[in-house]
Amino acid sequence: MANSNMKTLHSLEGIGKIQFEGKQSKNPLAFKSYNPSEVIGGKTMKDHLRFSVAYWHTLTADGTDMFGTGTMQRAWDSYSGMDLAKARLEVAFQLFDLLDVPYFSFHDRDIAPEGDTLQETNQHLDIILERMKEYMRDSGVKLLWNTANMFKHPRFVHGAATSCHADVFAYAAAQVKKGIETAKELRAENYVFWGGREGYDTLLNTDMKRELDHMASFLHMAVDYAKEIGYTGQFLIEPKPKEPTTHQYDADAATSIAFLKQYGLDTHFKLNIEANHATLAGHTFEHELRVARIHGLLGSVDANQGNTLLGWDTDEFPTDLYATTLAMYEILQNGGLGTGGLNFDAKVRRASFELEDILYAHIAGMDAFAKGLRVAHRLIEDRVFEDVIKHRYRSFSEGIGRDISEGKANFHILEEYALKHPLIRNESGREEQLKARLNQYLLED
């Protein structure tokens, strides 16, 4: 591993690897629920949850918002350029070690600065990638996924694959080409496409059909290139309805699935579902997970939460136990996430500016999902919801209901049946009772 030059530049000295101490512990630098070696349903917690640290929020975010400049106290920010990139890399793996996470993720521009030309930018990346491979080899930490930042630079003002300018489309293709090469080089288990500016602000100047066709063509090119170079990781689309554009083409899970199926991409892509993006789309986290799951396209998760009182992507660390429990319920029903994981696409609050806050935040999120895993497993084992659902839809298991389910009925048959059975008796959905049961399981764990 590269020689350490950061020992005196941050406040993590003296902090050991975060350990599981149980729910009675008062130590803020200890896990209360997350016990990586604990076996649940035949798998360890570590294997179930597959936690990942997001490079951008953890290493590059400075706390800047629309109303104020950065607040984060990060010693490595005294560097600039490639020196800054190298310093961030070293601290990143120190943090991964303290948290004992198996994975991390990044955008290309998180890990190395953009140069004056594409060639210079790629040279910067190559320098960092060589060092990163050393850290990965020495630590055993793996790359969950990488992606291309095609939303920050002014060239992407009108989008990337959906830009009205062919030169921008070409540049974006070159950037993703390098990204897929990076994924292969680092053995990334997935590669993510998040279309930050793949959408529009007004239809008055937008050829939507052309832009959708171009985006599909771009993704097919990516599939072809991955095959060409032998990259076998899972491609992921990350839905989001808005921000920074007014309307993004991958608005939610259902919209993204329709797009993938329309353009024959659904055999090559799955979805990376983010909790806060579900909130922005007017859905619950578990709704988006369910939609992806029942279509066989749930690939990975960006673990965070939004603030329903605010209209933007707040990317808070996940602490809502209802949300983490219902999320893990869907993930367990999915048979896990395969090559995916729980990536903390989350940032500490602007007022949580000390370096230790990064540890507190990740501990909170990891504990919340560990708790959710335990409760969700018990709910499934006890068939708390499954038996209710089976009973609720029992009329489709016999008689006319079975004929409907098996495709044997038609309007003539159903009209005849309705005329003979004029009395319909519905039953209560018992929503409040089920919520009380959920509370009971949360309190008992």
Swiss-Prot record:
Do you know which PROSITE patterns this protein is assigned to?
Answer: XYLOSE_ISOMERASE
What does the subunit section of this Swiss-Prot or TrEMBL entry state?
Homotetramer.
Question: Any idea which GO molecular function terms this record carries?
Answer: magnesium ion binding; xylose isomerase activity
**Binding-site residues for Mg(2+) 1, renumbered to this chain:** E238, E274, D302, D345
**Where does the record locate the signal sequence feature?**
none
Q: This protein is called what? A: Xylose isomerase
Going by the UniProt record, its keywords in alphabetical order are: Carbohydrate metabolism, Cytoplasm, Isomerase, Magnesium, Metal-binding, Xylose metabolism
Entry annotated with the keyword Isomerase: yes
Q: Which Pfam families match?
A: AP_endonuc_2 (PF01261)
| Location(s), subcellular | Cytoplasm
Q: How is the cofactor bound?
A: Binds 2 magnesium ions per subunit.
Query: Is Isomerase included in the keywords of this UniProt record?
Result: yes
Origin, by domain of life? Bacteria
Q: What is a biological process (GO) this protein takes part in?
A: D-xylose metabolic process
Q: Which residues of this protein are catalytic? A: H107, D110
The cofactor(s) it depends on are: Mg(2+)
Task: List the taxonomic lineage.
Answer: Bacteria, Bacillati, Bacillota, Bacilli, Bacillales
State the GO CC annotations.
cytoplasm
Q: What is its EC number?
A: 5.3.1.5
Q: What is its main location?
A: cytoplasm
Question: What catalytic activity does the UniProt entry give for this protein?
Answer: alpha-D-xylose = alpha-D-xylulofuranose
